């Protein structure tokens, strides 16, 4: 079976937690390409949650995903120093539909501000505007402690955990098989973070932050996480971006 995932510290540790991944063909992709790959062939993918909206045919695992319930997450917002009014924000890193759609909604709902969103591939420090960074660079470069957690903003908005990614497939059978693949995933996932030697490239302050907060990250979904998924994919409807409310095909 092929398994597609975006690449970040959390997904890497999901893969490292699998008891027997020799039968899996695992491939890390940019987050924006995972769903496309899942649609092209019978496979399992950890897709950005808002991709459910444009891919209603996909079956969604009700048991496994990547959910954030506090400050630790994969995306942080950084404000330009001395900025009194927020008008523009630049997105960079491993972007997907989640960040491009939710950034505007977050600032509209929580700050009553209509922001203009742009994309950039420039180095983080060369961008002098407000910015949102997705991925490991938040930690490897030590930026995170200056940033505002996107998960905290989303949690405040939907009153539920921020499920950033969900496991999905065109095949009901593959979703069924995933329960065996991810059996006892949570304890093995957390164990990966208990040994600091298993995390390379992180400065000490980032390593300590991740380890101290890792239990706010969930890879085995509960009812509150499923409610978080439902609330998240309804936000674009409430803001007039889509015409109908989408119901995930949970299995």
Regions found by a protein language model. Give the residues of each.
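General small-molecule cofactor/ligand-binding pocket signal
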Residues: 25-29, 116-120, 246-248
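Hydrophobic residues within well-ordered alpha-helices
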Residues: 37-40, 125, 236
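Paired acidic/hydrophobic, glycine-rich loop segments that form the ligand-binding mouth/hinge
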Residues: 4, 42-49, 129-135
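Bilobed "Venus flytrap"/periplasmic-binding protein-like clamshell domains
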Residues: 1-20, 72-128, 227
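Secondary-structure end/capping motifs
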Residues: 174-239
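Pocket-lining segment of extracytoplasmic ligand-binding domains
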Residues: 118-200
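Short, glycine-/small- and polar/acidic-enriched structural segments
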Residues: 12-86, 95, 99
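Long, low-complexity C-terminal extensions of enzymes
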Residues: 241-251
